[in-house]
Design a protein with these regions (language model features):
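Hydrophobic helical membrane-anchoring modules
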Residues: 2-21, 27-29, 34-56, 204-205, ...
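Short loop->beta transition adjacent to catalytic acidic/histidine clusters or analogous donor-positioning motifs
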Residues: 54-56, 77-90, 99, 112-114
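Short, well-formed alpha-helical segments that are part of the catalytic scaffolds
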Residues: 65-80
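Acidic helix N-cap motif at the loop->helix transition within catalytic regions
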Residues: 67-71, 98-106
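Conserved donor nucleotide-binding strand/loop of the catalytic core
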Residues: 87, 101-135
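A conserved acidic beta->alpha catalytic loop
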Residues: 93-101, 148
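Acceptor/aglycone-binding surface of glycosyltransferases and processive sugar-polymer synthases
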Residues: 119-135, 140, 152-234, 261-270, ...
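Short beta-strand-to-loop acidic/aromatic patch adjacent to the donor-nucleotide binding site
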Residues: 139-147
Length: 305
């Protein structure tokens, strides 16, 4: 019998109660409810004679990433092949106006692991992640940023947490600060910490880092959480964590290596107010019972999607 071992130096924080909660999630059998993936164009040509699913799905939202998307895909596919992962890569194009989509298509012709999804225009990072996670075929789905601030090799730390029984594993930049190989400028650290503190207080989230764009979900957790997600832009991370806790999923927060990318598009000054508005929307949704609705159960492995 094979046992999985969490990597050395792995002091995770755990939230929620482990165990089988399928009977308490309000799931029902049937097709997936329309979520972010409903209107997304999928370049993947399904082979109806082969219903096998990969073990892992890696979702990468992109918007005007022509300067680095090929490098990112090279790193991700190289890691998949070097480690022998049974994985697919879903690149979700959020209405890019540069050559991003064409570059991904060209890369995919030489890398069968890669498939391109196209949003109906520019809808936001939250929409892109939701689309990719709902269309992911893997037993475990992870989303990561195109800048690979968390090296894709760190995904193994999240996968290990899920093999140990977690429903969701989230990367954290703050549990082990010495794992940051390139720190943010002080002003970004300050605003980031302020936003994280406000978010944790308003939404009663216990996590050290809500905003790290490196999170992995079991298929059931992903299909439940992302069907209920409503925030489509930067503030979606706190919402999906709020939903996950509300639906009683077991979450492990895992320290990961991380390097700040100066090309990051998130501006805490410009986007911070909008994100604060979005967390108040989440609280309002919770008050109205938006996150208590039953959701469709995902097809079992081997069923056609």
């Amino acid at each position: 019998m094979m046992t999985s071992v969490i990597p050395r130096g792995f002091p995770p924080r755990q939230y929620g109660v482990p165990g089988d909660r399928s009977s308490s999630l309000g799931c029902k059998r049937g097709g997936l409810a329309r979520g972010g993936g409903g209107d997304v164009k999928d370049d993947f040509k399904r082979n109806t004679g082969n219903s096998a699913r990969p073990m892992y799905s890696i979702v990468i939202p992109v918007y005007n990433e022509g300067s680095r998307v090929l490098s990112a895909l090279g790193s991700v596919v190289g890691c998949i092949r070097a480690r022998g992962w049974d994985a697919e890569v879903l690149v979700v194009n959020d209405g890019s106006t540069d050559s991003t989509a064409d570059m991904v298509r060209a890369f995919a012709r030489t890398a069968p692991e890669v498939r391109l999804l196209e949003n109906p225009g520019n809808r936001g990072k939250g929409f892109s992640v939701r689309s990719g996670m709902l269309l992911a075929r893997g037993g475990v789905a992870l989303f990561t940023d195109a800048d690979l601030s968390a090296p894709i090799e760190e995904a193994e730390r999240l996968f290990a947490a899920i093999r140990q029984g977690a429903d969701i594993a989230i990367g954290s930049r703050w549990l082990e600060k010495d794992r940051q190989t390139q720190r943010q400028p002080l002003y970004r650290q300050f605003f980031g910490r302020c936003f994280n503190t406000v978010t944790r207080f308003v939404m009663r989230l216990p996590f050290a880092d809500t905003q790290c764009g490196f999170k992995a979900f079991t298929r059931q957790a992903a299909q439940t959480v992302f069907q209920l997600q409503t925030i489509e832009r930067w503030g979606f991370d706190p919402e999906i964590l709020f939903i996950a806790l509300k639906r009683d999923f077991w979450i492990i927060e895992v320290p990961v290596s991380w390097a700040h990318d100066e090309r990051s598009r998130l501006s805490y000054l410009k986007d911070g107010f909008k994100m604060l508005q979005e967390i108040t929307i989440v609280r309002w949704n919770a008050f109205r019972g938006r996150y208590d609705k039953p959701v469709d159960a995902p097809p079992r492995t081997g069923e056609k999607q």
